[in-house]
């Protein structure tokens, strides 16, 4: 069974909080990919400058609000299956789905929330 998993950077929707460094550009790849159930899927996100580990990953399904998967680059949100994992620091980050399942069809995006010291 083939599924299409979208990895999309929603740069225009990134929020600017007081003190946040909103000049940081995020680049996510691939923009889209095709994968099969059981595949290991990796999505990468690169920041234009170092953001330490201030990086979150979200999953969004059509008609639904975004769901937080990972915070602080590698910390799994409560209730999120362990098939999801995050890694990286500085400028390069990855989200990995260890064994893709039909319910994982979604858009995935990263968000930086680095702030000034």
From Swiss-Prot:
Region of interest: Complementarity-determining-2: 72-78
BP terms from Gene Ontology: adaptive immune response; immune response
CDD domains in the cross-refs: IgV_L_kappa
GO cellular component, one term: immunoglobulin complex
Transmembrane segments: none
Region listing for Framework-1, in residue ranges: 23-45
Location of region: Framework-2: 57-71
Keyword Ribonucleoprotein assigned: no
Disulfide cysteine pairs (residue numbers): 45-110
Signal sequence bounds: 1-22
Purpose of the protein: V region of the variable domain of immunoglobulin light chains that participates in the antigen recognition. Immunoglobulins, also known as antibodies, are membrane-bound or secreted glycoproteins produced by B lymphocytes. In the recognition phase of humoral immunity, the membrane-bound immunoglobulins serve as receptors which, upon binding of a specific antigen, trigger the clonal expansion and differentiation of B lymphocytes into immunoglobulins-secreting plasma cells.
PANTHER family in the record: IMMUNOGLOBULIN LIGHT CHAIN
Subunit structure, as described in the record: Immunoglobulins are composed of two identical heavy chains and two identical light chains; disulfide-linked.
Protein name as catalogued: Immunoglobulin kappa variable 1-16
Organism of this sequence: Homo sapiens
